[in-house]
Amino acid sequence: MFIGFDYGTANCSVAVMRDGKPHLLKMENDSTLLPSMLCAPTREAVSEWLYRHHDVPADDDETQALLRRAIRYNREEDIDVTAKSVQFGLSSLAQYIDDPEEVWFVKSPKSFLGASGLKPQQVALFEDLVCAMMLHIRQQAQAQLPEAITQAMIGRPINFQGLGGDEANTQAQGILERAAKRAGFKDVVFQYEPVAAGLDYEVTLQEEKRVLVVDIGGGTTDCSLLLMGPQWRSRLDREASLLGHSGCRIGGNDLDIALAFKNLMPLLGMGGETEKGIALPILPWWNAVAINDVPAQSDFYSSANGRLLNDLVRDAREPEKVALLQKVWRQRLSYRLVRSAEESKIALSSTAETRASLPFISDELATLISQQGLESALSQPLARILEQVQLALDNAQEKPDVIYLTGGSARSPLIKKALAEQLPGIPIAGGDDFGSVTAGLARWAEVVFR
């Protein structure tokens, strides 16, 4: 049996075909979405959990070495890895919020798969993280289906996050494919996420149209200009319908990070001065919220940065504010900070102003964020997104008849307004912002695996 599988930066979802239509399966708490989050007692617990409780093989030298190190470390630290030691989605977030200092938490593992300079042991770790999530998702799906799931059509961005170009894309897709097969899928095929989203929109068309699909996911923005219509639906070879692609490593997470940096970090002393009037360095505040950047987070939570923060508290004109950043460092609160920014961004989709409160840092710590504040904070990442739209059109040398906007950030009025200004007079259509890629993957799986 086949599934369409959107292993997303922000959320994961799975769909099957029933009576000719995609049907999304429940993943968590009666929702079809599983937030892309994972927690465990330690980083090493994940590898042992896969082996001990799910008989997932360590196929090569690096994964075997990682498993041996993990088992040894957990024994030395007297950590008992049980079947419930690894949690996913909102359950993992709840555990992290309850005890951030004692819970190892990861959001959006997909963000790191294309990172440059990963050592073999780091690649092996990310493969185990992805495998654990995919295994959990396959089990959730399997519990709702009578036949064994053996085939998966998995979405991938045009360009994964990372600076290595084709090499980064090869590395990231390789991690996904190996993880999927270790998680129990026998046949694994990939399709570009914007193409998949377009396939779901295509069933609504009565005639051929040039459709510009703009898919703003959690970690990437992908644009494809596609010929779509009834005559294309059942064709296995659609090469001639793909007019132009582009993709960048900017997505919803980057919007959240930018909003947190510009609007929340000043509450924690960013932009302040020392008693002598010297500006405080900005980098610690940026690294604190750059949750999709491995080196930045490693630097922020290093012992050396802890010493720097001590010095900044000592020298700052407003030491009580910088001490709040020190609390973020001490209690590992980066994810909660960015989550608060995300909640504010979502609220501003339907209101002119929202209050962002940070009681997990300090009881009364809060600020008002307006639409203008949001627009200012997001101007740089938004410009990058619009560049990709133009690049896809330049590659295609064609103009679209319609724009199909999808992805978690698609409901933002700010993005719709920017697209309308860039391409005036072209209608903007939308569908299931969180499910269109998954539905399209299920439709394409039916074509490929039938």
Task: Mark where each language-model region is.
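Extended, hydrophobic alpha-helical segments in both membrane/secreted and soluble proteins
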Residues: 176, 209-224, 405-408, 415, ...
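Conserved phosphate-binding/catalytic loops in two-lobed NTP-binding clefts
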Residues: 183-191, 416-442
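Phosphate/oxyanion-binding active-site loops and adjacent basic polyanion-contact surfaces
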Residues: 105, 125-134, 168, 191, ...
